[in-house]
């Protein structure tokens, strides 16, 4: 059984700027500030370069796993809670379906182009047909429990994490990749712009 290594990467601003044209080309036709922040995080992470316990490290793994789909299937976005507040679980169900329907055009193409630029293949476990079918068969209240304050999003996943002994992780609030990696702050203009604003001309 293989162990897991936490590879910590630190991308200097100058390096970010030097790769910006490449990232924009790969993510096009997506061109929003949010898309750029996500694409940049995926681009640098998929290089597999960084440090493990302070020692330089580069992975030779060719297959990457992506968590794409978990938010769309299990109500992980803030707008899902907003939909629930507006119209209860019926409104939430419609919002989840809308997000799931647009994954191919909004996310998959962008992510696949960016990740494959480093000669790696990506797998999407949450988008496996059986996983999607199973989650779609469940009542939405089993997937999201917004009566809880911060931890009602992705409720089913949090329950599973707790069952597997990942109690600490199960209690953490969600952080989007662009905020968890700080990629949203790499571009001075983008840091103060709305995520839906256009970052560049596609």
Stretches found by the model and what they are:
Residues 39-59:
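Phosphate/ATP-binding catalytic cores across multiple sugar-kinase/actin-like superfamilies
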Residues 29-32, 47-51, 141:
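Short amphipathic alpha-helical interaction elements and helix-loop-helix interfaces
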Residues 4, 51-54, 144:
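Intrinsically disordered or highly flexible coil/loop and linker segments, enriched in small
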Residues 1-36, 40:
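A conserved beta-strand->alpha-helix junction
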Residues 56, 60-202:
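Mid-to-C-terminal catalytic subdomains of enzymes
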């Amino acid at each position: 059984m293989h162990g897991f290594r936490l590879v910590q990467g630190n991308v200097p601003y100058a390096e970010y700027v030097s790769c910006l044209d490449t990232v924009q080309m790969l993510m096009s036709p997506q061109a929003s500030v949010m898309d750029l922040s996500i694409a940049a995080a995926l681009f640098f992470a998929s290089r597999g370069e960084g440090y493990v316990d302070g020692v330089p490290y580069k992975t030779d793994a060719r297959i990457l796993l992506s968590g794409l789909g978990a938010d769309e299937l299990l109500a992980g976005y803030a707008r899902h809670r907003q939909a629930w507040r507006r119209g209860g679980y019926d409104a939430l169900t419609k919002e989840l379906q809308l997000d799931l329907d647009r994954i191919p055009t909004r996310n998959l193409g962008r992510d696949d182009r960016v990740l494959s630029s480093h000669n790696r293949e990506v797998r999407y476990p949450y988008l496996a047909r059986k996983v999607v079918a199973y989650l779609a068969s469940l009542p939405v209240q089993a997937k999201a429990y917004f009566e809880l304050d911060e931890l009602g999003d992705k409720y089913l996943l949090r329950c599973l994490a707790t069952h597997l002994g990942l109690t600490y992780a199960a209690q953490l609030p969600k952080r989007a990749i662009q905020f968890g990696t700080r990629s949203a702050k790499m571009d001075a203009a983008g840091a103060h712009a709305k995520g839906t604003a256009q970052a560049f001309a596609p």
